[in-house]
């Protein structure tokens, strides 16, 4: 059953960091990878994570949660259920079966693209975009542009982890960006 505003207790997220495994030199030498699979397998940790995201957005009358491929698909449906909202996947090109809206964006060495079903968002629907990680902000920014091109009102963006030193938040200044856990290295 979806929660109601009065049923969300404050969640202290800092203990969740202990459930995230740090893997040095992955996927390449010099990178410290924050592996959330150890958090996902912990039923109380995963529940606390979803509760904390829900607590932040419960008062905002959200219509849709947009989950960015691929880990946004883990958190998005659970959050959508908790907020009594729908879930919409944002995918790489060629993965959705019906007519899609397409947005191409620049990467450091090339381009990438995202797609969403053209009928996924009705004009004026209130949307949250979720993913596991905010790093440089490029994919999140592209997702906001894709969603607003279909008429979405972006209420905010929610992330499990934010790598503060990569300054991805700067690309999303006009939005409420909420990250549960922050890392500065």
Report each predicted region and the residues it spans:
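Active-site-facing substrate-recognition patch
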Residues: 2-62
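PRPP-dependent phosphoribosyltransferase catalytic core
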Residues: 2-8, 12, 18, 141-185
């Amino acid at each position: 059953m979806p929660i109601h505003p009065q049923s969300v207790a404050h969640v202290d997220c800092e203990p969740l960091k202990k459930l995230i495994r740090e893997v040095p030199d992955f996927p390449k030498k010099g990178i410290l990878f924050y592996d959330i699979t150890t958090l996902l397998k912990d039923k109380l940790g995963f529940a606390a994570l979803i509760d904390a995201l829900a607590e932040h957005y419960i008062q905002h009358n959200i219509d849709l949660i947009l989950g960015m491929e691929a880990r946004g698909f883990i958190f998005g449906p659970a959050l959508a259920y908790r907020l009594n909202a729908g879930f919409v996947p944002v995918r790489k090109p060629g993965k959705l079966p019906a007519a899609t809206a397409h947005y191409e964006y620049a990467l450091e060495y090339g381009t990438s693209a995202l797609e969403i079903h053209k009928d996924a968002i009705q004009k004026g629907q209130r949307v949250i975009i979720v993913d596991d990680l905010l790093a440089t902000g490029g994919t999140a920014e592209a997702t906001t542009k894709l969603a607003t091109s279909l008429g979405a009102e972006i209420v905010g963006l929610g992330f499990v982890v934010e790598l503060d030193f990569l300054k991805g938040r700067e690309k999303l200044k006009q939005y409420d960006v909420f990250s549960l856990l922050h890392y500065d290295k």
